[in-house]
From Swiss-Prot:
GO terms for biological process: response to hydroperoxide. GO terms for cellular component: cytosol. InterPro entries: YaaA. Transmembrane segments: none annotated. It comes from the Bacteria. Belongs to the UPF0246 family. This is UPF0246 protein Daci_5283. It holds the Pfam family H2O2_YaaD.
Length: 261
C-alpha cells in the first residue's frame, strides 16, 4: 500500500531534529534543478503575481531559489516529513513516531511536490514554495502538470511493484490539486480515496481545516497499524471519526464525525 499526501506551505527548519535520524535523497534529482533555474528568472514582483503571495513571501522565496544547491546537506536541508508543518502534518505528528514507524513510512508514504515531484518521508528537502497548481511555464509546457507528465505515476508504479501482490493499492490522502499530478492513464495500481466529513448546520460536509488534519491522522493510523490493505483503514477511529458504511464504496471510504454542540 502507498499513501499519498500533499505537502504544506508552512515549513519548520528551526526545531532540532532527533539525533541520528537517517536520511535519503529525493528520487528526482535533475527536475528540481531545472525548475529552480526557471524560478530564478522571476523577479520578486513576478513571483508575487505568479503565486498570489505577498511581497515579503516573494522576497523570501527568491532568496530560497538563489540559495538552492545541487548538494543536500544537514545544513541546508532536512527530512521532508519533519520539515512540513501544516494541518496535515499536525495530524500526523511525525516527531512522535519511532524509528520503526519512520522506516515503515519510508516504504509506504509518498508526498507529492511541485518542485520535487515526489518526496519520501526521510528524503532531505531544501526549503521552497511551489504549489502544484502554479502556472509556471517551462520547456515542457505551461504548467507543472505538463512538466511532470507521467513521471510521478511511473515512480508510484515502481514502488508499488516492490510490494506484495495483494498490497499494491494507492490510498489517496492528497488534495485534488496534487493528486491531479498523478497521470491516471499510466498508473497501474487501483486507487482508494478517503473523505472526511464533519456535521455542521444539519448536514455532513467536508470542512477544509478538519479534513486536512484528518488526512494526517489517517496516515499516522496506517503507519502505526502497519496497514497492508485499504480494508484495514476502515477501522480508523481517531478524534471521533468513524466509517460511514452506507456512504462508502470499495474505492471511496467516507469517514464522518459529529461533535457535541
Amino acid at each position: 500500500m502507498l499513501l499519498l499526501l500533499s505537502p504544506a506551505k508552512s515549513l519548520d527548519y528551526d526545531t532540532p531534529l532527533p539525533p541520528k535520524l537517517p536520511h535519503t535523497l529525493p528520487v528526482f534529482s535533475e527536475q528540481p534543478l531545472e525548475l529552480i533555474e526557471v524560478l530564478r528568472r522571476q523577479s520578486p514582483q513576478q513571483l508575487s503575481e505568479l503565486m498570489g503571495i505577498s511581497d515579503k513571501l516573494a522576497a523570501l522565496n527568491v532568496a530560497r531559489y538563489e540559495a538552492f544547491s545541487p548538494r543536500f546537506t544537514a545544513t541546508n536541508a532536512r527530512q521532508a516529513l519533519l520539515a512540513f508543518n501544516g494541518d496535515v502534518y499536525e495530524g500526523l505528528q511525525a516527531r512522535s513516531l519511532d524509528a520503526e514507524d519512520l522506516d515503515w513510512a519510508q516504504q509506504h508514504l509518498a508526498i507529492l511536490s511541485g518542485l520535487y515531484g515526489v518526496l519520501r518521508p526521510l528524503d532531505r528537502m531544501q526549503p521552497y514554495r511551489l504549489e502544484m497548481g502554479t502556472r509556471l511555464e517551462t520547456a515542457h509546457g505551461s504548467n507543472l502538470y505538463q512538466f511532470w507528465g507521467s513521471r510521478i505515476a511511473e515512480h508510484l508504479n515502481q514502488r508499488a511493484a516492490r510490494q506484495p501482490a495483494g498490497e499494491r493499492v494507492i490510498v489517496n490522502l492528497a488534495s485534488q490539486e496534487y493528486f491531479k499530478s498523478v497521470d491516471l492513464k499510466h498508473l497501474k495500481p487501483p486507487v482508494v480515496e478517503c473523505a472526511f466529513e464533519d456535521y455542521k448546520n444539519g448536514a455532513y460536509k467536508i470542512i477544509s481545516f478538519h479534513a486536512k488534519r484528518a488526512r494526517g491522522l489517517m496516515a499516522r493510523f496506517a503507519i502505526q497499524r502497519r496497514a497492508r490493505s485499504a480494508a484495514e483503514l476502515e477501522a480508523f477511529d481517531l478524534e471521533g471519526y468513524a466509517l460511514a458504511p452506507a456512504s462508502s464504496t470499495p474505492a471511496r471510504l467516507v469517514f464522518r464525525r459529529k461533535t457535541a454542540d
